[in-house]
UniProtKB/Swiss-Prot annotation:
Reaction catalysis annotation: O-phospho-L-seryl-[protein] + H2O = L-seryl-[protein] + phosphate; O-phospho-L-threonyl-[protein] + H2O = L-threonyl-[protein] + phosphate
Organism encoding this protein: Oryza sativa subsp. japonica
GO process annotations (BP): signal transduction
Cofactor binding: number and manner: Binds 2 magnesium or manganese ions per subunit.
Protein name: Probable protein phosphatase 2C 17
Length: 735
């Protein structure tokens, strides 16, 4: 009897160990069957593919909707990576875009609407369990029997507490006109491919291992600990919950947000999204939106390079490529979902968008004499309705990891005035998720196109700020007034973009509007800057009441550099694409020293590296350092591009001409927004320089110098020598 009991116990112990071993990976064998769907219109083509892989169950969800409404030509793509269950991710996939459509700012301020929807989704999960009706099947006979028979007298309603340890990431892309908005929380990622297969991260993963000191302090104050990739909730000496969370999206995880003594933004996990906006240009090839299952195995550059080669070199179909990329995620042991969005050639001609928030697209504003040949108004660009005549709404069954349920919705059945509970925009929806961060980083981009700049003639009795500035109304009206020679065409720096499109807010209220600036590497926390003499660009980042300007114009041999945009650090984070010159490596060592020893020590090392001939760091005279309320006298009084003295304006050579045009645009923007002062370089765009057909700049510069905007050569030399003396004396002067 005892031997039989021992054998039985031993058998159950072996069975338990085998189950535990198999559950560690999810399944004994991966589920490699894929769900794939594709659709296209005259602007874009997308393919979505998802696979359970080694995951114990499918917890990813996604939404792909080619035409979100009937009036604005808006497309929506979202990936939601659930953890602790698929319910929160599935709810986001079914409801996020509906909440966005029903938001009051959807038509007038899409950026603000997207930002608010992230927060409202979290609140909906916390306050009511009505969301479960969207993800739990209604045709379950057992549930119906229990409700109708056994539970004829239902038990008293328990207090709703929300999903304690379930949550989801979110990475969504909204395309309207020729504008693209990316919002994300968590470790799902969106990557852009530019011409030639250049990978650009449009989102930055929110992970505890990348937390800043302020974030770690917030977690500790809320009663938790941030240990690498883990967040633990601690009570006394006991760890009552150990949750592997690779992100902070507040869609669920309310066990980490229940400290009643703290505000929402001070909880252990928060739900503040990163929002980025950018123009869609002809050099953009495709977007890759994927869950963490893909990015934990391969990096962004490898994925983009593979897709680019398969598309352009081998000519493979987008559907086949998407399924191949999904298989890369098998090694992660997790679910994998990938959405590929391909931009069709010539579909996105440049348009100015309603400054109120991506409302109605209008054609590029250019003066009548400087309008480029063949330019036309594309504001009424249509959408192929035939491709969406009978759209479908699809989603995973909550009880099945591979099954799907289909429903067809006729377009005439959609009530545009319906509420969020009843209005289901046409499109294709499924399962996926994300996590967040407590700091909002936003960035965006805008291009400056060719046209003539209207500059009123300055008066000797008036100041530059009062008189010498761009007349936005005249420019918008197409006036051809200019101070340059008749044959000269001047870069149009439409001040309406800065005045209306931005909201530069230095008050206590955080800035919510994005600043549309050209991005060479538009990520949210780190900016990879392409240092190229023929492609000088800059990026402006907003971080809660702090503003930073990063400008790439260095021509001292460096190819790429990565700058860390934080208010307390030394200001630079080393990173590279391709070959890195020794000067960059030395700068990287200086950066580490600067972070360890503080800003003052960093400045000392900057000076030391400069004396040794290093460049491409904050001490480099070819680089304008970041600009913000915290920065002090480290910024030149009048930052300029290298070799920008007015007495060099008549020098020959194509490179010198381009440099003169760049300086011209820099100075003209000073005229348009004198109140911005050091932010004068904000609206520069390299491709706008190509519109400057004539080199007859002398009359214009003479007029600007008379107005006191440009320094006279002697004054410029004196100021340059003064800066050199502060930097290091005669040696720096010779440099």
């Amino acid at each position: 009897m005892n031997s039989f009991l021992f054998s039985a116990l031993f058998f159950f112990w072996l069975l338990f160990c085998s189950c535990k071993a198999s559950s560690a990976m999810g399944n004994s064998l991966p589920v490699e069957s894929k769900f794939t769907f594709e659709e296209e219109n005259d602007r874009i083509k997308y393919v979505v593919s998802s696979m359970q892989g080694w995951g114990e169950k499918m917890e990813d969800a996604h939404a792909a909707i080619l035409n979100l409404d009937d009036t604005t030509s808006t497309s929506f793509f979202g990936v939601y990576d659930g953890h602790g269950g698929a319910e929160v991710a599935l709810y986001c996939a079914k409801q996020f875009h509906i909440e966005l459509c029903n938001h009051e700012d959807y038509h007038n301020d899409l950026i603000n609407a997207l930002d608010n929807v992230f927060l409202s989704m979290d609140e909906n999960l916390q306050q009511s369990d009505a969301w479960r009706e969207l993800v739990i099947p209604h045709d379950n006979g057992c549930m119906y029997f229990l409700k109708a028979g056994v539970c004829a007298k239902p038990f008293p309603q328990a207090t709703y507490t929300g999903p304690a340890y379930e949550g989801s990431t979110a990475c969504v892309v909204v395309i309207r006109g020729n504008q693209m908005i990316v919002g994300h929380v968590g470790d799902s990622r969106c990557v852009l491919s530019r011409q030639g297969g250049l990978a650009i991260d449009l989102s930055f993963d929110h992970k505890p291992c990348t937390r800043t000191e302020s974030e770690r302090e917030r977690v500790q104050n809320a009663g938790g600990r941030s240990l690498g990739l883990r967040c633990e909730q601690v009570m006394g000496n006991y760890v009552v919950k150990e949750q592997w969370v690779l992100g902070d999206f507040g869609g669920g995880d309310f066990a980490f947000k229940k400290n009643k003594d703290l505000d929402r933004e001070k909880q252990m996990l928060v739900c503040d999204p990163d929002i980025l906006a950018d123009d869609i240009t002809d050099d953009m090839e495709f977007l890759v939106i994927a869950s963490q299952g893909l990015w934990s195995c391969v990096d962004s550059a490898d994925v983009v390079s593979y897709i680019h080669d398969r598309l352009s070199v081998e000519g493979a179909e987008l559907r086949v490529i998407c399924e191949e990329v999904v298989e890369f995620g098998l090694a992660s042991g997790e679910n994998t979902t990938v959405i590929l969005v391909q931009f069709k050639p010539g579909a996105f001609q440049y348009q100015l968008v309603d400054p109120a928030g991506f409302g109605t697209a209008v054609s590029n504003i250019a003066s009548t004499s400087a309008a480029p040949a063949g330019a036309s108004d594309t504001s009424d660009e249509g959408v192929d309705d035939a491709a969406t005549a009978r759209p479908t709404v699809m989603g995973y069954d909550a009880d099945s990891s591979t099954g799907s349920a289909d429903a067809t919705v006729d377009s005439d059945e959609v009530d545009p005035n319906a509420t969020a509970d009843s209005y289901n925009p046409r499109g294709h929806a499924e399962i996926v998720a994300s996590h967040t961060d407590d700091e909002v980083y936003t960035s965006g981009s805008a291009r400056v196109e060719s046209g003539e700049l209207a500059v009123p003639t300055p008066s000797a009795n008036n100041t530059v700020a009062d008189e010498v500035k761009v007349d936005a109304a005249v420019v918008a009206g197409g006036s051809t007034t200019a101070m340059a020679a008749d044959e000269a065409t001047v870069v149009s720096l439409l001040s309406t973009i800065v005045d209306n499109y931005y909201s530069i807010n230095t008050s206590e209220e955080p800035a919510r509007r994005l600043i549309p600036l050209p991005l060479s590497q538009p990520t949210t926390r780190f900016i990879n800057i392409n240092i190229n003499a023929e492609n000088a660009r800059m990026t402006y980042i907003v971080k809660r009441r702090e503003y930073f300007l990063v400008k790439s114009s260095c021509r001292c041999g460096g190819r790429h550099q990565q700058r860390e945009v934080t208010s307390g650090g030394a200001g630079v984070e080393h990173g590279s694409i391709g070959d890195v010159p020794p000067s960059i490596r030395r700068a990287g060592r200086w950066m580490e020293k600067g972070r360890r020893r503080g800003r003052r020590a960093g400045s000392k090392y900057a000076k030391k590296e400069e004396e040794e001939g290093a460049s491409c760091h904050a001490g480099c005279r070819h680089f304008v350092p970041e600009i913000g309320p915290w920065s002090e006298a480290t910024i030149p009084e009048n930052p300029r591009l290298p070799n920008s003295d007015e007495n060099d304006m008549d020098a020959g050579g194509e490179e010198a001409k381009q440099e003169r045009h760049l300086v011209l645009a820099h100075e003209l923007f000073l005229l348009s927004r004198p109140d911005l002062d050091d932010l004068a370089n904000v609206a520069l765009r390299s491709d706008a320089l190509d519109a400057v057909k004539s080199d007859g700049m002398a009359p214009l510069f003479e007029s600007l110098a008379t107005a006191g905007v440009l320094l006279k050569p002697d004054d410029a030399a004196a100021r340059r020598d003064a800066r050199a003396d502060r930097r290091g004396g005669p040696q720096a002067r010779r440099e």
